[in-house]
Each structure stands twice: as C-alpha cells, then as structure tokens.
C-alpha cells in the first residue's frame, strides 16, 4: 500500500483593499450622481427662474407671445421718451419760453404718463404687432430711410414765437348769446382803429391795455407767451397769421371762428432746431439703438397706414354745414324731479363766502337787508320776468353771474334729489314741484336769499326734434337753451363737417339727412344723444385742424374693429406685478 501525501489546495482570497475600493467606488459614484442631479436641478431652477423673470409671457397677439423682456425693453424706451419730454419742458421754462403755469401743466402730464407707462407700453406692443400685419396686408412698407426721417423729426424742436394779441369781442345784449350785425360792425371798427393807431406810431402796449377786451391778457399788453404751429388752444386763422408775421409787425385784423376780432404781433422767434446728439444721448442713457429703431419703425407703420386712409379723404368732397344739439348721458339719466334753474343771490353785506362761513351772525342787520332786497327783486320779476337776466348780471352777489361774460345766474348742473347743491337750496325747489318758467319766492340758504326761476325739466331729444321739425321751435334757440355741446352758445354751430371727421354714427346721420332738415337722433352709449341740423352742402377740401380730425377719426374707425377681432391676451396680474 502506497501512502501518498494529500495535495494541499490553496483557496484564492480577495485582498481586503478590493472590498474597500468597491465600496468607495459606489459611494463616489452615488455622490457624483447626486452632484450631477443637484446641478441638473439647479440648472432647471435657474432656467425656470430665468424663464419666469425674462421669457414668461405677459400677453400675446394671435398666439405670438409678448415676454417680460419685450415689455421691459418697451417700457424703458417709453420712459426715456418721457424723460426727454421733461428735459425739454425744463429747458423751455428756463429760457422763459414757458410760463410757470404752462411748465407745471406739462410736467403734470408727463407724470401722469409715467404712472401708466407699463400698461401703456404693453398696449403699444400689441398695436405695433397688429399694425405690422395690417401694413403687410395693405402693401405698406417702411424703409430704413423712413426710420431715419422719423428719428430726425423726434430730434427736432419746432419753431416757436412769442406772441401778443389785441382782441375785441362784440358786445351782446343782456340774455343774448350772439351779437347783432351792428354790434359786430362796431367791434370791427374798434379793432381796425386800434390797428391804424399802431401803424401810425402809437405804442402797442398802450393800445392793448386800453382796447383789448380779453381780461386775461389785456393788463399784460396782450402777452400770449410762446406758441407753436400745433397750438390747439389758439384760433386757427389767428395762429396762421402769427406765423406769417414778421417780428414786431402787426397782423391784419383776423376774425376768429368764435366771432372775436384780433390783431397779433410777434416779438421774438426761436427757429426750429435739431439736436445733433439725440441718438448719442439715447445710447448714453442705456437705450439699445436697434431696439429703439424697431419701435420707431412701428410708429412709422402707423403713420403710413393713416396716410393711406386719409389720402382719399383729403380730396375735395361734399361737406355739410351742421348745427348740433347734444345731451350728455348724465343729463339723460337724471331723475324725474330734476330741474334746470337760474338764480339771483342777495347775500348779507354782499359777501356769500362770509355768510356761509358763519362770519356774519344770524342777527346781523345785513341779513334783514338781504331779504328786503330779495323781496323787492321778486316783486319786480313777477311783473316782468324778462328782466331776470339783466338783474342777475347787475345785482347778483354770485360773482360768476355778473357782467356781460357772466352766466346770468344759470346753473350748470340740474337741481335734483341726488345733486350736490346744499339741501337748503335744492329742497325748497323740489318740494314746490315747479313747472317750466315758474318763479319761486325767495329761498334762504347759508349764502343768503335766492330768487329762483325754473327754466326746464330734463329735455327729451326726440320730443325736441318733433317740435323743431313741426316748426314749433327753432333749432338754434333750442341748442342755446338745452345743448351741452361746446358750441351751444353759438346755436350749436359745428361749421363744415366732412365724412370721417366725426364718429361714424354721427357722420352717417348727418349725410343721411336732407339739406335743411334735422337728422335722426343719434345715441352713443356712455356718451349721450345728438341731433343735427344740416344747413348746406358744398364741395370742399379739408385742411388744417379739420384734416387732422379726419386723420385721427378715420384711423380709429378703421383700426379698432380689426384690433377687436385679433386674438389678444393680457396677463394683468404680471403687468400689475411689474408696475408694483
């Protein structure tokens, strides 16, 4: 038997370091993955944050988003434009080209625009996108040269002139709203003599202070301050004469649309100027020139669309000479008890302010005298109510009622159960349930004693039309008595009206009416009611302010329905957040 030694088999054993490495490897891998995940999450968070801060939509037009950055860029541009406007106000005020009141008004307008700059900027982006599509559809193109020209226009300060006036307003009889032919002739003769005196060597200042009937400027020798060609406050014909005049050379006599006669003079001219550093200022103030040019391009697109629309309207076409009666929505909505009145006030010591403030004791004899005066006036007017206007203009202690330019005691607002008049005045009137034309006995209030005549209850425009059409009433008289339009005192005279000049519903009514007849009553929601009298028709070419009005109205009437039809969305909450 052979004995062999049993072979020894040695088992392989992993070294201890291998186990540790594997564990470390997985730990490191897990840590790495965690880091990667954290980076990814952070990246996502950053991306979301960036999106929310920059790319989140604040609105859209036909599915095309308007991002926060779009709105910020446009807001920055519009804010810069307002800054430039304010700088110009400050410069002109410092140069004496604006009065303090004018500068304050323009500054207030700039401040108001600043308060709405974000929502207004969003609306401008919306308009630009819609109008760009419309321009493409209409074949309207804008070149770089067009943009350059618009930038030059923005950089240009227009010519301004230091203007002076002497005006003579024709006198009118008490209660009348229009002068007679003799009164107009007398006014013309007065101002023509003034012009002759100036040309003969008499000092302008002396003539202005003694002849001009404009109480606001006569004491300052007729100083109107600085005006530009686009001054909408100055009579158009007179403004044209001022810009045609040489320095210190009086204009001819100009009869204004308001019937007032004027002579003008220009003492100084500041020529049109161009800011050669305009674009440099823009970029120095942090505005991207490329983005600014894109905004200007949008402005030019709108102008070109307007030009295309107004091209036909600016040609000679039938126009209609028109009078208007207008009743505001507030008047239409008045309660049934409302009445229009005029009054004559007799105050103790002729001082309504002191009376109402309690500065005149109730037992002061002047209260008794005021009552005696009121009682005497009441008796006088009961015998002859036609004296009311003259008495109000000469004896009323209400300052606004007195004189040829006063109200004659006619109150602007109706007296009603919800009017703002003191109860001591309104309650006795309403309790009397008066009829039109009725004269009421003296009414005591904290201001004194009032003689009140009820003029009318709220008018029904359809009923007034019936009276006019049947010959029972004259259109111009009704306009003077009832209309709330700007031309009411002139019988509602609107002058010549072209198609496209007024709101479409009004224009349609005017051109549908036969010459010499009234139109249908036109109701404009939230505005009021209109009735027109067509007096004449002529072929005329629109120009000046009439053409400007046509341009604005035509574009609005054409564009607004198209904007309403577009798919426009606005995220008001985001816009409000940006504004806050």
Model-derived features: positions:
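Peptidyl-prolyl cis-trans isomerase
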Residues: 2-66, 97-580
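Short extracytoplasmic
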Residues: 54-92, 337
